[in-house]
């Protein structure tokens, strides 16, 4: 039986096919990174200099808001402009298999067979947020492969909204006209992370009300009514319609400030999608002109460094037999009240794995 080639050789062959633009190589690279198989760090290290050209767009919102349908329409708009699109869809985890419970290929079947589109569903795997630990690295692989746009869609529950904002250049929050969504947006802190709001299913009653509520909140947040005041006092028109003031500010082509626009869409008809695509382009221009893009990407790099550090520490310490033996032999001391779990970790960090290995029975 022929022995499997070393990991370095497998990665080298994979990279050769990857550089040749073979879709199968892209799929294998994504799987290697997602599952952290042997060689994935070498792969990401080699690809790192090629990363940074793609625009990363995060899409989040409550279940049933039509995120996948709207994403499909946005993909169609980008493909019409001859742009290649990668989609990373984070799905709930199956409690039995640990895999994505509902792959987005089912919901995006109209674009799934397009050679200029790549779709991968990732599982949350029990993480508190909707973004799996591998999402940013998978996006890096798609970036290095040459995709122009990378859309990251999340389940929109828990802390996933914050996760998506950290992973994307631009964050789109999708709401629906049903009562309470706009107030819930404020409670969930979405006002702080949304770069664009979309009220989807706008053919339902209440869409204009939700948009006005969001624009009112934006107006209060950005102080637009106050800014509109003349030197003799308050602009009564702006105070009477702060939502319109926010809307007008959102349409300004100003590289120094950004007011999130609120866009009405009917995704299954394609209504509002051109305006959404235009607003995404405007926001990208703002990010570049204001320097905010560099700030966001540096913050993302810092978080990736911390993720790598956490992974390495976990692999080198918690998987070390000497460390496990030290913890096991320390359990009686914890039970007897001699030391707390925190004290054991302090001892572990002070001694370090090499010292523990020398003193373990």
Which role does the model predict for each range below?
Residues 1-49, 233-245, 324-329, 344-361:
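Non-catalytic terminal/linker segments enriched in charged/polar, low-complexity residues
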Residues 9-20, 27-65, 70-160, 167-182:
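Nucleotide-state-sensitive switch-loop elements of NTP-binding domains
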Residues 44-63, 71, 93, 159, ...:
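Glycine/charge-rich, flexible interdomain linkers and switch-proximal surface loops
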Residues 177-205:
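Flexible active-site lid/hinge loop adjacent to a nucleotide/diphosphate
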Residues 196-284:
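Canonical P-loop GTPase G-domain recognition
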Residues 256-259, 263-267, 271-356:
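Long, well-ordered amphipathic alpha-helical subdomains in the mid-to-C-terminal portions
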């Amino acid at each position: 039986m022929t022995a499997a080639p070393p990991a370095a050789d497998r990665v080298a062959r994979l990279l050769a096919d990857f550089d040749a633009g073979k879709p199968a190589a892209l799929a294998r690279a994504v799987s290697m990174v997602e599952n952290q198989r042997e060689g994935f760090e070498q792969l990401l290290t080699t690809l790192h200099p090629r990363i940074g050209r793609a625009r990363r767009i995060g899409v989040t919102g409550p279940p049933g808001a039509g995120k996948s349908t709207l994403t499909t329409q946005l993909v169609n708009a980008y493909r019409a402009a001859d742009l290649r699109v990668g989609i990373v869809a984070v799905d709930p985890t199956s409690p039995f298999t640990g895999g994505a419970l509902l792959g987005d290929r089912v919901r995006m079947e109209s674009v799934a067979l397009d050679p200029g589109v790549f779709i991968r569903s990732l599982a949350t795997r029990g993480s508190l947020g909707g973004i799996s630990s591998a999402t940013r690295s998978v996006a890096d692989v798609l970036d290095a492969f040459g995709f122009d746009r990378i859309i990251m869609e999340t389940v929109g529950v828990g802390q996933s909204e914050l996760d998506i904002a950290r992973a994307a250049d631009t964050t789109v929050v999708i709401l629906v006209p049903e009562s309470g969504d706009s107030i819930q947006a404020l409670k969930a802190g979405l006002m702080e992370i949304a770069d664009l709001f979309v009220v989807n299913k706008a053919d339902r009653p209440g869409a204009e009300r939700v948009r006005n509520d969001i624009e009112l909140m934006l107006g209060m947040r950005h102080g637009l009514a106050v800014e509109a005041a003349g030197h003799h006092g308050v602009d009564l028109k702006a105070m009477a319609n702060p939502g319109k003031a926010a809307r007008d500010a959102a349409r300004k082509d100003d590289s120094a400030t950004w007011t999130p626009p609120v866009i009405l869409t009917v995704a299954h008809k394609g209504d509002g999608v051109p305006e959404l695509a235009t607003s995404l382009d405007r926001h990208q221009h703002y990010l570049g002109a204001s320097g905010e893009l560099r700030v966001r990407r540096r913050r993302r790099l810092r978080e990736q460094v911390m993720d790598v550090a956490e992974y390495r520490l976990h692999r080198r310490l918690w998987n070390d037999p000497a460390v496990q033996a030290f913890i096991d032999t320390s359990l009686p001391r914890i039970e007897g009240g001699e030391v707390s779990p925190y004290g054991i970790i302090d001892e572990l960090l002070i001694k370090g794995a090499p010292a523990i290995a020398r003193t373990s029975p």
